[in-house]
Amino acid sequence: MHISILLMEQIIELFIMIFMGFIIVKAGIVKDEDSKVLSKIVLYLIIPCVIINAFQVDYTSKTVRGLLIAFAASVILQLVLLFIISAMGRFFHMNEVEVASVYYSNSGNLIVPIVTFILGQEWVLYGCAFMSVQLVFLWTHCKKIISRESSYDWRKIVLNINMISIVIGVVLFFTRIHLPQLINDTIGSVGSMIGPASMIVTGMLFAGMDLKKVFANRRVYFVTFLRMLLVPLISLILIKISHMAYLSTDAQKIMLIVFLAVITPSASTVTQMCQVYGNDSRYASAINVVTTLCAVVTMPVMVLLYEEFI
């Protein structure tokens, strides 16, 4: 119950940030299209800093074992969910934005502040294991469907700053190299902006929408149901039958972090990619806002279910 209350407080805080982005557009300070610049800053600067900073922890056998559990769980969950959601997409005639919004969680923007707030900074590494796996899917599968490209450009994928940051972070961790304090502090400070910056982008986009149309669109609620209820319940079942929460003394907490990453609202990165690659960013933003609003209730409930059944 304690974790659920802390989680609810953190989600409300992030929702207030969305409201701030909404207000600065409605007040005429900026335009909703100005958010595209901030989206690029999040995608190509802030997220890489988050990843590198997360891997700047002490190398121990316990940490390595926990990291391997987190990576394995993240890969298994995301592959199984990709298969299930792709099948649902065909069955329910979902478009690219809907499929991406159901599949991709907002772990990149929420898991760091949420885990830091409810468990402590030392546990963030395991959340970043999920983020790293999801980033690979984001810059392959998600980029392909959102940009409507017919094939993968592997050179661009490999040379993407997010992919490079994952490699740098992993290499630094396993070689036990710590960056100079000044550089590490700078990277950490930039990375800490991820939650506010992403939420402000969402709020700015939301301000440019016809709110009556947003809330009258039944598809938004259908996508929200899939993202916030069905996907978490499927994930909970997968975690239960895999027995991965019992692989070590810390495994239950590690799997809780992975579960938290899965049950977050639809990814702000989908909105940002829609902006960058010319898809329906306003629809993606509407889904993001509605799922974030629902998360105030659904995420604490899902955590209670996890604590009860895992």
Language-model segments: what does each one mean?
Residues M1-I310:
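Alpha-helical transmembrane segments of multi-pass small-molecule/ion transporters
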